[in-house]
């Protein structure tokens, strides 16, 4: 079977189990829930604000919700009891001085979630990071060294989930913008070589979700931005760019 046929076959497959979404009430997190629903994949949400989750997702979410903080291990453990995989979409708010710094969320929060997920036996961990995390002189690093903190979180995920029997996927999207998914081609690359670019949150969410069941996405760190205006039936085929 050639690579194209393999990709086509994989589009008929889906993930069996429940996905814990950390950061589900953020703009990207909301789209992750939407795309999980589109793929008929069960999910459980780990959120700081139950009221916001109910506002965004409606009262039917109440049985699929754990309220807690990424800074509190016992609350994370309570959420992980419902999970077979994790999609982590947490991120510090660098524009709000009252919010925890990137070191607490993008580094320590990601590390804590990954460590506890592995202890719980979660086999696959998906992290949404950022373009340019290896560039210490990037202007964004003026805000609490946010890119460096994200890279340190990434490094812990790779360290933990590179062991046999486990796997990870780390997405490094470009600048996040709004809009519906599947309206553009994608550009994937590795090695943090993409200088700049934008991508819809909805497409980041779609790529994160299909990474649950696409073997080509496992044990992969890659950058992604949108390409040409070109409606897509699936984004699976773009993994051929990095495999």
Annotate the PLM regions.
Residues 23, 47, 129, 172, ...:
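Short beta-strand/turn micro-motifs composed of small residues
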Residues 44, 66, 87, 126, ...:
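Hydrophobic/aromatic beta-strand patches that form the interior of the parallel beta-sheet core
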């Amino acid at each position: 079977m050639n690579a194209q046929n393999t990709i086509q076959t994989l589009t008929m497959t889906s993930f069996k189990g429940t996905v814990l979404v950390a950061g589900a009430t953020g703009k990207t997190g909301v789209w992750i829930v939407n795309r999980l629903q589109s793929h008929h994949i069960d999910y459980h949400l780990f959120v700081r604000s139950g009221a916001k989750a109910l506002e965004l997702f409606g009262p039917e979410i109440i049985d699929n919700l754990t309220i807690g903080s990424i800074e509190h291990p016992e609350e994370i453990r309570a959420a992980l009891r419902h999970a077979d995989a994790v999609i982590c979409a947490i991120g510090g708010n660098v524009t709000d001085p009252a919010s925890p710094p990137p070191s607490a969320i993008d580094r320590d929060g990601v590390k804590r979630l990954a460590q506890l997920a592995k202890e719980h036996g979660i086999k696959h961990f998906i992290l949404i990071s950022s373009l340019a995390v290896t560039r210490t002189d990037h202007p964004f690093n003026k805000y609490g060294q946010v890119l460096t903190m994200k890279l340190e979180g990434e490094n812990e995920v790779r360290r933990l989930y590179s062991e046999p029997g486990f796997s990870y996927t780390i997405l490094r999207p470009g600048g996040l913008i709004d809009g519906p998914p599947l309206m553009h081609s994608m550009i994937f690359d590795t090695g943090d070589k993409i200088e700049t670019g934008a991508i819809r949150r909805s497409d980041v969410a779609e790529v994160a979700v299909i990474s649950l069941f696409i073997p080509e996405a496992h044990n992969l760190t890659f950058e992604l931005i949108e390409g040409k205006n070109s409606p897509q039936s699936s984004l699976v085929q773009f993994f051929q760019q990095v495999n």
